[in-house]
């Protein structure tokens, strides 16, 4: 039956900011859904608070709202736009929960809006643990023994029934938030308390543990005529007990017999029928007992998920696009498969003739206090995917795509006790310890006994270790064509072979080239080569026939950013996608190289050709050899491609845009200093030190406090503010490895300076400022973690003009062609240059959304030789409204990690708020970031000596709004002396009742807590920040943040909603 004609406009709810458990896979699904529905003639209205997404680009939907995703805001949008239906299955758990809130609060009934894609009942049945269990029993499928609980007493009674270890799963959360595995009563009580808080319905499932069972997932699509297809079966390398988002996964499933596969296939179709998903995609998770084959259902997601993004990329079947069309009434047989050029219908089940491996990427180095053991609560921040013709090839390609310094199964330890520990308690590198165990002489049976990973997977790694041993016993010239080809087919990189042979990677590469041994490229075609495909979606392997068939058009190759991590996230993918779109429009053939399955850049129709490959020198050079591009762009994927720039130039690759030499001039301290001196610009006093003694001497020359860091970093890794020689000594000994080649940088720290970010674009002749952003948090907080406002909310016009002048001077001096970002600090009216990055920065998407100028597209065209004049981009656009970007943090996933912000970046994502005043925009950004300010209660202030004066204004603002003020002794005394009425409250060490009690009792509406840097005061006040985090009370660890919130709260009762299209239209008419 064709599409529904009774629906004219559809509202899509996005997933909001990137958090652990919900990353950019929902930008990919949302963008696909927008395209699919507009193709069919529907008016699409979109709401999403995350500006760094492709889906919030003004051309993706008819009307786009970058607004907080909460039912109250969405109700305003519904009242304004009057959609006929809402599609809630494209925005992860955020969108589902928002849709349920709209239904429960009567909004859908009031405006007569229908939920499509999943009914309220189907969402509830799948997400409510108790109802789901009943539904499974009804169709004869077993679930683990479990009980639904709403109180601690019920939970304790349930625990006695299921025994230890016990699994705790909260309802209506994602990424296993709040859940965990308890091995004793203390752990059980702690996890339950956390879980009740995390579940919006205050409900937990207490479940029997099936640790060590094998875990599988099925990606299923079903239409309203009950046509069902399995897109892909996925098998977890890690057994049950590790969240599937933190597990290494393989597709298709490798260790099922055909009979077992058919049983699981039938079960997953039965689950969809019973839950009532009849218009879209779902994923169903199973566990199988390896001892006797018993199969149980773990859970299902009635929506597009992280796994469906993986399944889409693994097979080439666009699940989100198909699901969106099914939601408006199409059936699978009516839709065509794009990859085969329409030769097959969408009801044709994909089959694949290769193996896909996904490995998660973690960021524990950012959270030294966090527990890095993997459990049922998700902790990874990104993932990498690789394809090969064998499991060994795809596994080794995925390892080197992770960008954690691996080039294969690099050794981690020779200590048998440590290896045993790592196998038994899964951590982020367990697969490497499996390899170490084989090297150390463990047998396959022993390893399986300790870690419960399937013997078939273990045998694959064992075989690779035998190969490694044989290679390291020989010399390079022993490897003839046949021997080297055999190793390459098993996925060994040149670099890993070089390590084993004790030679350089270049020598291995030259030896391989001399033997004329190169990979071929195979196409992803959804049908295992049954039909020919025009779609150039390619992966490398060492076989006979190459299917790449390159054209002879003028081509530009764009290197992507690889797996998401803290410091390099979706913002860089956004820039890569824009480069591909712009250059395609300008008549170039575009080639994308990337290995992140969550992103829009790895969608097969974003660029003309997609190579799904690791971003290593070896892999990139082979693609260049095959495609022979006119130019390569390395400036848009963050640090990943920049690291390859010099080596690519050495190998004769034409890098377009800003030259590798200019990038080096900006990143190399001594060269950059010379550029600034020549221009007469100021930097904070700084020095370079190559060892500890030198650092201590030079520190005295500049004076404390200092910012110290290693050279060449992104996301402020291992950066610290130190206040004394003792702290500096500790840093030099514990945090960094210093040498002649990698010195440590010392900068004088500008206290209480205002930090400013500027993005600009240049074609080599003209420079246009994209936007000037004033940071909310003072200098010293990493720019990626700081809120910022465009236009600036308190900088004078003179200072802004001086910043413009300096930015342009540096762009000319460095010969920038494309984008450039500068960070300034302004102290007492003096402008200092902190750093310059002649590349795309993480603020580019935000600036583009705020000003309506697509900077990344403009920059890419400049690189390809199209001038700013020709593009009609000649002057800076300054909005007549305020846009505020705010960072979003993962602290709730890492109990015990302190929330104090500093120079090391720790945010995973961002949101944007738009308003007529700075206050309104800031308040909306806080709502978007998940902060909820209670209308009643007290404001708690506890600040260090130098912040007391600044906090007076904050206290007065909140008092006017009717809040009571309470503070710790010193702060209270100071505020009382300045005419405020303040209640004094005990710090935790001072006896009860103390601030911790007040937070637990719900008396506190907001916390402003700043501390001096000495470890004692940090640890004394740690409990305040932890309690605030657990009680979900908004907290600010800078006075600037607290003050901005006090301004913002004034406008909370009259917040407007503005579409991007109306805002940009206003700016166009004004200019």
Swiss-Prot record:
Matches recorded under SUPFAM superfamilies: Carbamoyl phosphate synthetase, large subunit connection domain, Glutathione synthetase ATP-binding domain-like, Methylglyoxal synthase-like, PreATP-grasp domain
Domain MGS-like: 931-1071
Residues holding Mn(2+) 1: 285, 299
Database matches in SMART domains: CPSase_L_D3 (SM01096), MGS (SM00851)
Cofactor annotation: Mg(2+); Mn(2+)
Enzyme class, spelled out: ligase
Matches recorded under InterPro entries: ATP-grasp, CarbamoylP_synth_lsu, CarbamoylP_synth_lsu_oligo, CarbamoylP_synth_lsu_oligo_sf, CbamoylP_synth_lsu-like_ATP-bd, CbamoylP_synth_lsu_CPSase_dom, MerR-type_HTH_dom, MGS-like_dom
Residues in ATP-grasp domain copies: 133-328, 673-864
Gene3D superfamilies: 3.40.50.20, ATP-grasp fold, B domain, Carbamoyl-phosphate synthetase, large subunit oligomerisation domain, Methylglyoxal synthase-like domain
Residues holding Mg(2+) 3: 823, 835
GO MF terms, alphabetically ordered: ATP binding; carbamoyl-phosphate synthase (ammonia) activity; carbamoyl-phosphate synthase (glutamine-hydrolyzing) activity; DNA binding; metal ion binding
The organism's place on the tree of life at top rank: Bacteria
UniProt-annotated binding residues for Mn(2+) 3: 823, 835
Protein's recorded name: Carbamoyl phosphate synthase large chain
Cellular component per GO, a single term: cytoplasm
Binding residues annotated for Mg(2+) 1, in chain numbering: 285, 299
Stretch list, region Allosteric domain: 931-1071
């Amino acid at each position: 039956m064709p599409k529904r004609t009774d629906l004219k406009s559809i509202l899509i709810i996005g997933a909001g900011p990137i958090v652990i458990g919900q990353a950019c896979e929902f930008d990919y699904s949302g963008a696909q859904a927008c395209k699919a529905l507009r193709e069919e003639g529907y008016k699409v209205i979109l709401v999403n608070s995350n500006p760094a997404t492709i889906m919030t680009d003004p051309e993706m939907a008819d009307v786009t709202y970058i607004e907080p995703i909460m039912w109250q805001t969405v109700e305003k949008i519904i009242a304004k736009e009057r959609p006929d239906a809402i599609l809630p299955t494209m925005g992860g758990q955020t969108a589902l929960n928002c849709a349920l809130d709209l239904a429960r609060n009567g909004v859908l009934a009031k405006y007569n809006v229908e939920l499509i894609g999943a009914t309220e009942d189907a969402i509830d049945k799948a997400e409510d643990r108790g109802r789901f269990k009943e539904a499974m029993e009804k169709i004869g499928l077993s679930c683990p023994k479990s009980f639904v609980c709403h109180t601690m007493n019920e939970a304790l009674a349930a625990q006695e029934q299921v025994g230890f270890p016990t699994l705790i799963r909260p309802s209506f959360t994602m990424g296993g938030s709040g859940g965990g595995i308890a091995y004793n009563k203390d752990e059980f009580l702690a996890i339950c308390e956390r879980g009740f808080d995390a579940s919006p319905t205050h409900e937990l499932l207490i479940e029997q543990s099936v640790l060590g069972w094998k875990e599988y997932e099925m990606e299923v699509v079903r239409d309203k005529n009950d046509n069902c297809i399995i897109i892909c079966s996925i098998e977890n390398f890690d057994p049950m007990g590790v969240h599937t988002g933190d597990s290494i996964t393989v597709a298709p499933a490798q260790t099922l017999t055909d009979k077992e596969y058919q049983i699981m296939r039938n079960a997953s179709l039965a689950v969809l029928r019973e839950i009532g998903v009849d218009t879209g995609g779902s994923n169903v998770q199973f566990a199988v007992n390896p001892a006797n084959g018993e199969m149980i259902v773990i859970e299902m997601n009635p929506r597009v998920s992280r796994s469906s993004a993986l399944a889409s990329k693994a097979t080439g079947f666009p699940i989100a696009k198909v699901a969106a069309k099914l939601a408006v009434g199409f059936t699978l047989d009516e839709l065509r498969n794009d990859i085969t050029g329409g030769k097959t219908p969408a009801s044709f089940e994909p089959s694949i003739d290769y193996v896909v491996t996904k490995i998660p990427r973690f960021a524990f180095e950012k959270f030294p206090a966090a527990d890095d053991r993997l459990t049922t609560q998700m902790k990874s921040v990104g993932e990498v995917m690789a394809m090969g013709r064998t499991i060994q090839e795809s596994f080794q390609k995925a390892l080197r795509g992770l960008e954690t310094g691996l080039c294969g199964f690099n050794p981690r330890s020779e200590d048998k006790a440590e290896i045993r520990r790592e196998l038994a308690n899964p951590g982020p590198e367990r697969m490497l310890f499996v390899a170490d165990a084989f090297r150390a002489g463990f047998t396959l049976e022993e390893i399986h006994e300790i870690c419960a990973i399937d013997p078939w997977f273990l045998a694959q790694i064992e075989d690779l270790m035998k190969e490694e041993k044989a290679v390291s016993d020989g010399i390079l010239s022993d490897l003839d064509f046949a021997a080297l080809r055999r190793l390459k087919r098993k996925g060994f990189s040149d670099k890993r072979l070089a390590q084993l042979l004790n030679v350089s990677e270049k020598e291995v590469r030259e030896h391989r080239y001399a033997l004329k041994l190169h990979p071929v490229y195979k196409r992803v075609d959804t049908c295992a080569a049954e039909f020919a495909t025009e779609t150039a979606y390619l992966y490398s392997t060492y076989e006979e026939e190459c299917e790449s068939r390159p054209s002879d058009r003028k081509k530009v190759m764009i290197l992507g950013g690889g797996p998401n991590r803290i410091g390099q996230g979706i913002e860089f993918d956004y820039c890569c996608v824009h480069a591909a779109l712009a250059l395609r429009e300008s008549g170039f053939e575009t080639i994308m190289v990337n290995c992140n399955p969550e992103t829009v850049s790895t969608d097969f129709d974003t660029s003309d050709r997609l190579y799904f490959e690791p971003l290593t020198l070896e892999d990139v050079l082979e693609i260049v050899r095959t495609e022979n591009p006119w130019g390569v762009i390395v400036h848009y994927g963050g640090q990943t491609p920049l690291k390859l720039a010099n080596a690519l130039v050495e190998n004769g690759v034409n890098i377009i845009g800003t030259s590798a030499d200019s990038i080096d001039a900006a990143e190399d301290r001594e060269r950059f200093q010379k550029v600034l001196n020549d221009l007469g610009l100021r930097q904070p006093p700084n020095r370079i030190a190559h060892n500890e003694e030198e650092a201590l001497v030079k520190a005295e020359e500049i004076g404390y406090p200092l910012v110290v860091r290693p050279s060449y970093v992104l996301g402020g890794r291992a950066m610290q503010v130190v206040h004394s020689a003792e702290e500096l000594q500790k840093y030099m000994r514990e945090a960094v490895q210093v040498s002649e080649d990698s010195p440590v940088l010392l900068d004088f720290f500008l206290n209480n300076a205002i930090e400013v970010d500027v993005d600009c674009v240049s074609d080599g002749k003209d420079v246009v400022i994209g936007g000037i952003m004033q940071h909310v948090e003072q200098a010293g907080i990493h720019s990626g973690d700081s809120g910022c406002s465009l236009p600036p909310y308190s900088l004078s016009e003179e200072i802004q003009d001086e910043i413009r002048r300096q930015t342009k001077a540096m762009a000319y001096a460095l010969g920038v062609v494309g984008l450039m970002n500068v960070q300034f600090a302004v102290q007492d009216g003096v402008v200092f240059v902190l750093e310059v990055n002649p590349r795309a920065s993480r603020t580019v998407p935000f600036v583009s959304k705020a000003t309506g100028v697509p900077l990344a597209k403009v920059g890419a065209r400049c690189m390809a030789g199209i001038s700013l004049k020709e593009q009609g981009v000649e002057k800076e656009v300054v909005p007549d409204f305020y846009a505020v970007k705010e960072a979003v943090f993962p602290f709730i996933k890492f109990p015990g990690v302190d929330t104090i912000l500093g120079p090391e970046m720790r945010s995973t994502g961002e949101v944007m708020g738009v308003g007529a005043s700075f206050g309104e925009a800031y308040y909306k950004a806080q709502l978007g970031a998940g902060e909820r300010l209670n209308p009643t209660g007290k404001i708690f202030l506890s600040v260090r000596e130098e912040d007391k004066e600044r906090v007076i204004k904050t206290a007065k603002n909140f008092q006017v709004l009717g809040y009571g003020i309470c503070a710790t002794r010193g702060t209270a005394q100071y505020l009382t002396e300045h005419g405020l009425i303040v209640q004094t409250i005990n710090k935790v060490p001072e006896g009860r009742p103390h601030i911790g009690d007040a937070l637990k009792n719900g008396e506190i509406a907001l916390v402003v807590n700043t501390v001096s840097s000495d470890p004692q005061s940090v640890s004394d006040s740690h409990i305040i920040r932890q309690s605030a985090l657990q009680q979900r009370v908004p907290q600010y660890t800078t006075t600037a943040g607290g003050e901005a919130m006090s301004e913002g709260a004034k406008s909370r009762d009259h917040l407007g909603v503005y579409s991007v299209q109306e805002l940009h239209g206003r700016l166009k008419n004004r200019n």
